């Protein structure tokens, strides 16, 4: 799942080297903490958070196969 998130993020940002994704896995859930360059943060979040919400929706759909709850957090 991390690879899918990585691919999505890489296609949205200019500074691919600054991408950092931390995966915290629990018993029934996974939390992804995403950090990108400050200049790219707006591209990840989008107008009114629509891109961020779309990323979260895609990850929830992917996680349904593994029967785990996924949360994606975008950190400054």
State what each model feature region is.
Residues 50:
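Residue-level recognition of oxygen-bearing side chains
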Residues 1-43, 53-76:
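RNA-contacting regions in translation and RNA-metabolism proteins
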